[in-house]
Amino acid sequence: MHLTQKAPLKAALLTLALAASHGAHAATFQDEAIAFATNNPMSLTVKGDDVTVNLTTNVSLLPGVHVEQKDEAPCPIGLTTTNENGNDTLTIKRVDSTQPCKAVVVVNLPEKSTVGFTQRTPSIDAKGNFGKITTHAEHMSLTFEGRADSLELRAAGVATARIRVQQLPISLISVSARHVATNISLPAGATADYKIDPASSTFDKAVPSGNPSDTTIRLTGSTVVGAARNQ
């Protein structure tokens, strides 16, 4: 998702790297959650056999939701919007899921709005190879390296990964607009790989009280690269 720094409306770009399905795999991990906040533009890329994506926001989606074709071959995408309990849900569904393709769905959001979606990730193995996070001063990117049969808002009976993106006032983050704070919660056995630069960036790991099976990693810095394990 790309959230422009100075525009009053935030344009969130969801890049779908859509591949053909190769069959489901059993899930043997707990729910994972990632929440991050930054005043810098953000880029979110999801790779895998994504067929359906549901985005839900705490405010009404602004007009202008559309699909941008990024490959020479067309990537037909259907968009529908529903409202439940004051939350808008945008369903992004591939029209043809038999061929790999890529498209960008552009969503306009008001300032300080939140966006969330739930991802079915049945192929993430018991070792918990969760993904990779990289950041620098201008944008943040989050990549899931495993395949996903679909992305769903509600996926009853399956293990899910939940992502929440929240745009915050710059005063709550840093006066320099270059500070990024990331909180990552991983299940037992999961790993998270990322980079840390400059050396002045800080990295803290702690086990939340009352739940020793989960490890929370807090990453602070303009750009960070490193590795963390739940141990």
Identify the meaning behind each predicted range:
Residues 146, 150-231:
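Short, surface-exposed interaction patches in beta-rich subdomains
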Residues 27-85, 106-108, 126, 186, ...:
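Short linear S-[DN]-x-LW-Φ motif typified by the pepsin-like aspartic protease active-site region
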Residues 100-112:
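Extended Gly/Ser/Thr-rich low-complexity repeat segments
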Residues 11-21:
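Bacterial N-terminal signal peptides
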Residues 27-29, 94-101:
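Extracellular beta-rich ligand/substrate-recognition surface
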Residues 2-12:
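Bacterial N-terminal signal peptides that target proteins for export
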